[in-house]
Amino acid sequence: MRADVQNTIEKIQKSLDLLAQRLDVETAPYRLEEFNARVEDPTLWDDPDAAQKLMRERQMLVDAMATHDSIKQEMADNIELIELGEMEDDADVVSDAENALRALEETAAKKELEALLDGEADSNDTFLEVNAGAGGTESCDWASMLARMYVRWAEKKGYKVELQSMSDGDEAGIKSATYKITGLNAYGWLKSESGVHRLVRISPFDSAAKRHTSFSSVWVYPVVDDNIDIEVNPADIRIDTYRSSGAGGQHVNTTDSAVRITHHPTGIVVTSSEKSQHQNRDIAMKALKSRLYQLELDRRNAAINEAHENKGDAGWGNQIRSYVLQPYQMVKDLRTNFETSDTKGVLDGDLDGFMAATLALDASGKTRAEAQNG
């Protein structure tokens, strides 16, 4: 067996070992038996929310077991084919099996990354906010480009995207937009996108065709699961209704029933501008609870993050990625050093490489400063 093929097998085995560890493969069959017993309980659906949560957890376990077993079996089958092909001097059989192992390596690596999405809220749906930075029309246009980028990414994933609120820019683009993205692991994938995103390009709004730098921020926070109890003291909030209107476009609603909720202790402000005022109150309150939950997650992780980060790595919580369109084309993540010259693809939603690099870095135990220094 050639050295490169052996190396491929070792990489698959490494991914398989991590999957087995995350799954706790020895106890998985017993846990599935417990789930099955609970599913057969005739009183299960007396509490629909708890029942749905149980069914989701059971399905996640079933899928994880199937993934592990499938990769393990496919690897063994192709190793056997290579050995038989070499014994019988059948180059075609060997070549086909080697190609299958290379494809399996990619699949196993992807499943390994997905297995890292095991944080408390990683499996949840998510809210995603985009806000234009200082810079007027330039930043508003950049915020609009970012919003489109994330909508395209979510659509490619098969996620459901709902616009919660949007404020148009004075001349072009948007000042802000909030989306709800629904799908398994939506928060887990997107959580690393929070931060400041920098764009460098020749401005389409500058008659002198000068190069401009624009900034917009992204904030991602999980939709609060019904089983997570977040209490909001009515005395701590102010609810305002207002008229929401924009300059036009398919995303703009015009309504007298838009709702803004301000949470005084934290200064958090959330809005919703659907047609129903009652619906807007519910949407805005859910968004507020989600933001408060994200604050709690941040507090819990503060000590870990402080220990994890190099003290000189001041850019992590602020600027996370640069998008250079002129004088050359490059998108680079400042935390992981992952980069690509396919700027068009990135702005069209091809973000998985960046997200995977961040997950891999966090799993490696390296500080972001160490990653930046190679």
Swiss-Prot record:
Keywords: Cytoplasm, Methylation, Protein biosynthesis
Record carries keyword Metal-binding: no
Stretches assigned to coiled coil: none
Residue numbers carrying N5-methylglutamine: Q250
Listed GO CC annotations: cytoplasm
Compartments reported by the entry: Cytoplasm
Post-translation changes: Methylated by PrmC. Methylation increases the termination efficiency of RF2.
One Pfam family per UniProt: PCRF
Similarity section: Belongs to the prokaryotic/mitochondrial release factor family.
Function as written in the Swiss-Prot or TrEMBL entry: Peptide chain release factor 2 directs the termination of translation in response to the peptide chain termination codons UGA and UAA.
Protein name: Peptide chain release factor 2
